[in-house]
Amino acid sequence: MAAPSLLNWRRVSSFTGPVPRARHGHRAVAIRELMIIFGGGNEGIADELHVYNTVTNQWFLPAVRGDIPPGCAAHGFVCDGTRILVFGGMVEYGRYSNELYELQASRWLWKKVKPQPPPSGFPPCPRLGHSFSLYGNKCYLFGGLANESEDSNNNVPRYLNDFYELELQHGSGVVGWSIPATKGVVPSPRESHTAIIYCKKDSASPKMYVFGGMCGARLDDLWQLDLETMSWSKPETKGTVPLPRSLHTASVIGNKMYIFGGWVPHKGENPETSPHDCEWRCTSSFSYLNLDTAEWTTLVSDSQEDKKNSRPRPRAGHCAVAIGTRLYFWSGRDGYKKALNSQVCCKDLWYLDTEKPPAPSQVQLIKATTNSFHVKWDEVPTVEGYLLQLNTDLTYQATSSDSSAAPSVLGGRMDPHRQGSNSTLHNSVSDTVNSTKTEHTAVRGTSLRSKPDSRAVDSSAALHSPLAPNTSNNSSWVTDMLRKNEVDEICALPATKISRVEVHAAATPFSKETPSNPVAILKAEQWCDVGIFKNNTALVSQFYLLPKGKQSMSKVGNADVPDYSLLKKQDLVPGTVYKFRVAAINGCGIGPLSKVSEFKTCTPGFPGAPSTVRISKNVDGIHLSWEPPTSPSGNILEYSAYLAIRTAQMQDNPSQLVFMRIYCGLKTSCTVTAGQLANAHIDYTSRPAIVFRISAKNEKGYGPATQVRWLQDQEKDVGPWF
């Protein structure tokens, strides 16, 4: 986590769709990039289900059906895959619920479920303010507040510290409640506390952590329950413990539990005053507990002022949800302020990146021409942009002259026989791509819809432009992220070479020029920026030359973005090998760089890569078809199709694919038999895939190949071939 002074809060100020009313007592969960909110309220209890797409910055109201639950507040809300469970909560003043509902988010279908009661004892009583946590196939219910009175208008509160376990059925439905026999001292009764479950990487013993809450007075105690031994304990912690609080949020990212907001004691209270009599206020304090070392770290203190409104203002009863390494916060009540008979609630949506993004996958080639590359890389969740860099063996003049002048190429060489490395091809395509169709990438409609069996690849292309060169604050990327959709079951990526295929091409001669004035020469190991891109695709035809005396262009600090308008551009050269790497950027800065990929610009006269690859199953195996290159550069003499196969060599170097030719001829289709597929290599680096390559040959020889990753479902698709 970044140092407190480096926290880069982002307020989402631009969004579309029906924005939910501000509220408190609601709950939120995440399904991939979607934040799903239910319940809570202010002027009455809300019963709508609201969804926020964190990529498109769009709110929407799904058309739910089935046993739609009544609105509730301070309820339990957990997510298991695309299934959401709701338990308990307040349905109206003084009347609480102990009903359980299940939402299948893939169909937006509600169902009321009736778990079996415990073998001994009673099922949970109606309650609010309890914790409801999921781990594996079980939910864990602890504490809350019940109403002892049968008259909802005569509220007699009773704080609870009972503990239940709810076993779930796989996919849908539940088995029933049980009351585990626990050991050790049980935490005191409470409501509006938080509970999370964490399991260390080297441990098979998950633990539930309960923090804070309310029992007449706010609490600041931390409790731990070992879910294997069912033993309660009170771990000793280091660092400054957050103030006693309730109605706060606790979110786990990695090995850290982040605590934000809630009701806390007023800082001006008399220390001799009983906790029951002192005043309380909302806070915007922000801390985390390292769950491995049991050490608290304060990121924003309760006394820290925010005169610039650069972070969420104090609140309680809000919601927080973790998507990747990013935390989102929405709404909540603003202290004791009232408007008529209602609380004043916050309307704002904020997020905070808790760490730099991981390295993206290697850059992958979609299409190469004589003077450009269309490249992509796997998307990294919750990032604001990508820094793309390249390196070449060619040397260029490094000068600060007019960027429109084309610099001379020194000592230039073009080797038509040199090809890119196969290591750039083993990464799979990410599960989601932008809704703007990308060449050779199959796209389908709704992010939660079940997969169709159609396996066509759409070859229509739309390229994404880099950010403006003089961007000074990367917060502008937040509202520019485009909508994503799930990738279908086949994705095509052109390759840089076909194994065992020789490319016979004459090098295009070009002159060596000697500069009239002494200039610095870029060294081969220096990396130059191509630019900063909002999406995971880029059309590369130029790059920025390093200023004289600089070894690198981009800093790795917070929002350190170079002013590209001051730098000189260099065009790509035909028949030249370029190395690429990419890094993701978020509010914490620029993350680590990816592994290096190599691609070669086309030599004039050779055919382009085949396009619009389609795969369909038939009785003999599969049918593979494609369209001719859009730029054949003469007559196409033949096509070759190749299949990546299993070999002993691949066990030593899995990234080095070995290909077997399965077709050679003039037709733009072929049949791949089940016998050939039995020898196929399955690439498991991301999602299981069988890899094909297809290339075209004209009078000069073979051009670049199109690589096809046929994504496999391990049970459905891989099974018949093995």
UniProtKB/Swiss-Prot annotation:
Each Kelch repeat, start to end: 34-79, 83-130, 207-255, 257-303
Segments of skewed composition (Polar residues): 419-436
Species, as recorded: Mus musculus
UniProt KW keywords: Cytoplasm, Kelch repeat, Nucleus, Repeat
Protein name in the entry: Host cell factor 2
Subunit structure, as described in the record: Binds KMT2A/MLL1. Component of the MLL1/MLL complex, at least composed of KMT2A/MLL1, ASH2L, RBBP5, DPY30, WDR5, MEN1, HCFC1 and HCFC2. Interacts with TASOR.
GO molecular function per UniProt: transcription coregulator activity
Gene Ontology BP terms: antiviral innate immune response; immune response involved in response to exogenous dsRNA; negative regulation of transcription by RNA polymerase II; regulation of toll-like receptor 3 signaling pathway; regulation of transcription by RNA polymerase II
Keyword Signal: no
Pfam families reported in the protein's UniProt record: Kelch_HCF
Domain Fibronectin type-III: 359-460, 514-604, 606-716
Lineage, broadest ranks: Eukaryota, Metazoa, Chordata, Craniata, Vertebrata
Stretch list, region Disordered: 398-476
Protein location: Cytoplasm; Nucleus
